[in-house]
Amino acid sequence: MYIEMIDETGQVSAQMQEQITELLQFAAEKIGKQNKEMAVTFVDNKRVHEVNLEYRGIDRPTDVVSLEYKPESEIVFDEEDLLDNPELAEMMEDFDAYIGELYISIDKAREQAEDYGHSYEREMGFLAVHGFLHINGYDHYTPEEEAEMLGLQEEILTAYGLTRE
């Protein structure tokens, strides 16, 4: 999985960015999304507030904003078209590869790590996996959805080695 890391704050270490990249690649393998692409942007509370308002209509900062990429209209080609035109087939693979982007507030990550009594690394990993699952269709609007998403999220974090301790 290709993951573009963007640090708008200048405060996220290369080591942390690498850990988030590895964690998201691990999560992608767990749910069968290895051949996808996404972006992760680290921001402050002011910027995440702007993004939250612009894309979700919610006028406050949050910890992570997940923007799932959904083409406005489905592009459908006949199988023969793709077999006859390798360039078109490659273009369609690339088009289908991009799944979305995350905006993670490092301010909220620090606050929540302290509030929940675990490390900043654990909170950053939690937010990255939580957002990643959202852009892959998981949600928590109903108790059933919440149990599935949070269970998978905890399974990924624990298997990767990011526990609450």
UniProtKB/Swiss-Prot annotation:
Disulfide-bonded cysteines: none
Membrane-crossing segments per the record: none
GO MF, one annotated term: RNA endonuclease activity
One annotated GO biological process: rRNA processing
EC number: 3.1.-.-
Keyword Transmembrane carried by entry: no
Record flagged with keyword Metal-binding: yes
A Pfam family reported for this protein in Swiss-Prot or TrEMBL: YbeY
Cofactor or coenzyme needed: Zn(2+)
Cell location: Cytoplasm
Protein family: Belongs to the endoribonuclease YbeY family.
Function in brief: Single strand-specific metallo-endoribonuclease involved in late-stage 70S ribosome quality control and in maturation of the 3' terminus of the 16S rRNA.
Protein name in UniProt: Endoribonuclease YbeY
Organism: Streptococcus suis (strain 05ZYH33)
Lineage summary: Bacteria, Bacillati, Bacillota, Bacilli, Lactobacillales
